[in-house]
């Protein structure tokens, strides 16, 4: 019974989150063969200003 955590920036629509979850379930099923009915996906949404890429706050030009 796989549990997959996915941390994302807040703001995706319910439709996009649903598609993301479906894609994660599909890839997990294809990769390890688990029955899609037992694959669990947990989405964690974070404010963009709490996320960093390469040492820069998401959306900022200068490092913090």
Annotate each language-model stretch with its function:
Residues 2-64:
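A domain-level signal for the structural core that forms small-molecule/cofactor-binding pockets
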């Amino acid at each position: 019974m796989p549990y997959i955590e996915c941390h994302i920036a807040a703001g995706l629509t319910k439709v996009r989150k649903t598609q993301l979850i479906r894609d994660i379930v599909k890839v997990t099923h294809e990769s390890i063969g688990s029955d899609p009915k037992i694959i669990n996906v947990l989405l964690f949404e974070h404010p963009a200003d709490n996320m960093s890429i390469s040492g820069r706050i998401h959306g900022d030009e200068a490092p913090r």
